[in-house]
């Protein structure tokens, strides 16, 4: 597939990830997907950067992973930090209000129903929202903002998200309600879906489970994503090479994954002991390892016995962690299996492909 880049500018240095073309590592080819330049989008047709580039043939027609297909490596563009800062200042001075016309036209003629997602082709948090929209089967369109044109600073968009970042969502069925921050958006979607259908899909009707879902969701948005973002920034984009910062944030990402790994391992053990009753005594005695159980690769989730937004919120960021030198398949096998199960879901595949 084509790969359109404009490596000369970056308008949000605080999120270095947005400027990185991140390819999949050889060991993680099973769980990396392409956020393609060809994403289906009726509103936007510009060619911004891809977060992950992987051959679409990795996805079989039945939605499973083709483990024999090698991922297409895309080199990271190393641009000196001072040049990026200088270019950002130039961008700030050169924006023309006419460049906002595409955004202005949308706000003058908004749909009557469904959702509009404002995202960016290299924004993991934006794809986090599209995954949940897709899983819930909701009608939505995506506008991929062009940061080089300053569309995220268009007055109409700032009225939706005063932080001038993505994602932001407009719920046209609620009088064009605007929601920003990915965690808040996910909670709005599942709560509204539950209220309207009576089905707690990706959510729970149990208050205790809801509290645990919230805890993991906030852990992802406040710990998991920022630490990966900082590790990428200091590894590839900071004006000076500060090894202590690279090491600090990389190790913090490992610590975060250790928390998730332990939780999933506990869920795995509980599931095996519950379902594999014939061998439970041997597992308890330690004479037979849990890895011998036929349920060792069975999907387990962070909360309860079903997939929720707590799990799905991690998916896009798990796709890029190999670029900071962490191989989750080797270091965190439960995280790897968990991610692979989610990446095989048809709705997730559709969301990441933009279908």
Curated annotation (Swiss-Prot):
Q: Name one Pfam family in it.
A: GST_C
Please give the InterPro entries that the UniProt record associates with this protein.
Glutathione-S-Trfase_C-like, Glutathione-S-Trfase_C_sf, Glutathione_S-Trfase, Glutathione_S-Trfase_N, GST_C, Thioredoxin-like_sf, Ure2
Matching entries from SUPFAM superfamilies are given as: GST C-terminal domain-like, Thioredoxin-like
Instruction: Pinpoint the GST C-terminal domain residues.
Output: 206-355
Choose any GO biological process term that the UniProt entry carries and state it.
Answer: regulation of nitrogen utilization
Q: Which UniProt keywords apply?
A: Nitrate assimilation
A GO molecular-function descriptor:
transcription corepressor activity
Chain ranges of the GST N-terminal domain: 113-197
One GO cellular component term of this record is:
cytoplasm
Q: Subunit structure of this entry?
A: Homodimer.
Q: What does this protein do?
A: Plays an important role in the cellular response to the nitrogen source. URE2 gene plays a major part in the repression of GLN1 and GDH2 genes by glutamine, and is required for the inactivation of glutamine synthetase. URE2 gene product may catalytically inactivate GLN3 in response to an increase in the intracellular concentration of glutamine.
Q: Which family does it belong to?
A: Belongs to the GST superfamily.
Protein name per the record: Protein URE2
UniProt organism field: Candida glabrata (strain ATCC 2001 / BCRC 20586 / JCM 3761 / NBRC 0622 / NRRL Y-65 / CBS 138)
């Amino acid at each position: 597939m084509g790969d359109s880049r404009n490596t000369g500018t970056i308008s949000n240095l605080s999120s270095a990830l947005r400027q990185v073309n991140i390819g999949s590592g050889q060991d993680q080819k099973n769980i990396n997907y392409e956020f393609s330049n060809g994403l289906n989008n009726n509103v936007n047709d510009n060619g911004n950067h891809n977060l992950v580039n992987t051959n679409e043939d990795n996805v079989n027609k039945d939605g499973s992973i083709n483990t024999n297909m090698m991922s297409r490596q895309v080199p990271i563009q190393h641009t000196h930090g001072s040049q990026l800062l200088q270019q950002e200042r130039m961008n700030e001075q050169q924006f023309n209000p006419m460049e906002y016309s595409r955004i202005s036209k949308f706000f003058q003629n908004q749909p009557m129903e469904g959702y509009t997602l404002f995202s960016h082709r290299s924004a993991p948090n934006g794809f986090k929202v599209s995954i949940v929209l897709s899983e819930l089967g909701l009608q939505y369109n995506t506008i991929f903002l062009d940061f080089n044109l300053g569309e995220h600073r268009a007055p109409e968009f700032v009225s939706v998200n005063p932080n001038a970042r993505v994602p932001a969502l407009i719920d046209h069925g609620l009088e064009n309600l605007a929601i920003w921050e990915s965690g808040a958006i996910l909670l709005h979607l599942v709560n509204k879906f539950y209220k309207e259908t009576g089905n707690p899909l990706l959510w729970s009707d149990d208050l205790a489970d809801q509290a645990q879902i919230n805890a993991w969701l906030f852990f992802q948005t406040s710990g998991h994503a920022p630490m990966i973002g900082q590790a990428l920034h200091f590894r590839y984009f900071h004006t000076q090479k500060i090894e202590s910062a690279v090491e600090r944030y990389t190790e913090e990402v490992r610590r975060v994954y250790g928390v998730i790994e332990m939780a999933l391992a506990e869920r795995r053990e509980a599931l095996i002991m519950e379902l594999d009753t014939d061998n439970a005594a041997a597992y308890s005695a330690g004479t037979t390892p849990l890895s011998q159980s036929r349920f060792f690769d069975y999907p387990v989730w962070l909360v309860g016995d079903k997939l929720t937004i707590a799990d799905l919120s991690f998916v896009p960021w798990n796709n890029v962690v190999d670029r900071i030198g962490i191989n989750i398949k080797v270091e965190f096998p439960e995280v790897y299996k968990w991610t692979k199960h989610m990446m095989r879901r048809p709705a997730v595949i559709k969301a990441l492909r933009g279908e």
